From Swiss-Prot:
GO terms under cellular component: chloroplast thylakoid membrane
Binding-site residues, [4Fe-4S] cluster 2: C74, C104, C107, C110
Primary localization: plastid
Superkingdom: Eukaryota
Gene responsible for this protein: ndhI
Keyword entries, A-Z: 4Fe-4S, Chloroplast, Iron, Iron-sulfur, Membrane, Metal-binding, NAD, NADP, Plastid, Plastoquinone, Quinone, Repeat, Thylakoid, Translocase
Any GO BP annotation: photosynthesis, light reaction
Function as written in the Swiss-Prot or TrEMBL entry: NDH shuttles electrons from NAD(P)H:plastoquinone, via FMN and iron-sulfur (Fe-S) centers, to quinones in the photosynthetic chain and possibly in a chloroplast respiratory chain. The immediate electron acceptor for the enzyme in this species is believed to be plastoquinone. Couples the redox reaction to proton translocation, and thus conserves the redox energy in a proton gradient.
Name used for this protein in its record: NAD(P)H-quinone oxidoreductase subunit I, chloroplastic
Length: 167
C-alpha cells in the first residue's frame, strides 16, 4: 500500500482509541456522580469518634496517688506533678497536676500505665486556641468532662462506619 494511506489508517485507529479512552474516563466520572459526598460540613456536622479514640485527657484528682508513673512513661516527660510528702502519714499528697496539650502527642501511655486509673482519654478533639498558653490544662481543667457530640442538639452527627443499604 501507499505510505500515505497507511498513515491515515493509523491516524484513524489512534483517533478511535483516544475516543474510547475519553469515553471510559467519562463513564467513571459519571459513576462517581451518583455517590454521596465524602466530606462533611465541619462546624455543623461532626463524626462520631470510635471507642478507642485518643482525645483530651481526663484527670480525677481524688484517685491520684502522685506516683509519677505517667511522667516516667511519657516519651516527652510532659505531665507536671507537684506533690508534698506528709510526714505524719508517710504518704504523698498531690498539690498540682498539669498537662500542656500544645506539646502532648496523645500517645496514651500515661493512661495505659496509671495504676489507679485516674487518667482516661475523652472524645474531645477541639483544642484549638489563639494563645498556646491556654493549652496548658491544670487539674481543674483536666477534671471537666467534655460535652458529648451525640448530646449536642445543634450538630448533626455522622457515623464513621460506611452506610450499608439493604434492598
Amino acid at each position: 500500500m501507499f505510505p500515505m494511506v497507511t498513515g491515515f489508517m493509523n491516524y484513524g485507529q489512534q483517533t478511535v482509541r483516544a475516543a474510547r479512552y475519553i469515553g471510559q474516563g467519562f463513564m467513571i466520572t459519571l459513576s462517581h456522580a451518583n455517590r454521596l459526598p465524602v466530606t462533611i460540613q465541619y462546624p455543623y456536622e461532626k463524626l462520631i469518634t470510635s471507642e478507642r479514640f485518643r482525645g483530651r485527657i481526663h484527670f480525677e484528682f481524688d484517685k491520684c496517688i502522685a506516683c509519677e508513673v505517667c511522667v516516667r512513661v511519657c516519651p516527652i516527660d510532659l505531665p507536671v506533678v507537684d506533690w508534698k510528702l506528709e510526714t505524719g502519714i508517710r504518704k504523698k499528697r498531690l498539690l498540682n497536676y498539669s498537662i500542656d496539650f500544645g506539646i502532648c502527642i496523645f500517645c496514651g501511655n500515661c493512661v495505659e500505665y496509671c495504676p489507679t486509673n485516674c487518667l482516661s482519654m475523652t472524645e474531645e478533639y477541639e483544642l484549638s486556641t489563639y494563645d498556646r498558653h491556654e493549652l496548658n490544662y491544670n487539674q481543674i481543667a483536666l477534671g471537666r468532662l467534655p460535652m458529648s457530640v451525640i448530646n449536642d442538639y445543634t450538630i448533626r452527627t455522622i457515623s464513621n462506619s460506611p452506610q450499608i443499604i439493604i434492598k
